[in-house]
Amino acid sequence: MKKLFMKPNFFIVGGTKSATTNISYYLNEYSKVFISKLNEPYYYCRFDVPKIFERESMIRDKKKYLDLFNKATNDQAIGEATSVYLHCPHAAAEIKKDNPESKIIIVI
């Protein structure tokens, strides 16, 4: 039975131009991995990003964020890639609060 809301259990973060997007594409080729189609949703640093750097694709609403993972299944590792989580002061704490068992892959 599928859960009502699927949540990511791993995150890919890293420096600018460190290939976080490429890694997410490679991982998504495996049937046991689900990566959100939206690259860099910025959800966990939505309050840390100055207005000047906000993107149209930035997600602030929790339901919209969880909707990114609604096609994932219980037997998949579920992830997302937002490189700037590495630099956002509150991202790691927010990720831990929402997803205490999740893993963070840091690409440098």
Residue ranges and their predicted role:
Residues 1-86, 94-107:
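PAPS-dependent sulfotransferase catalytic core
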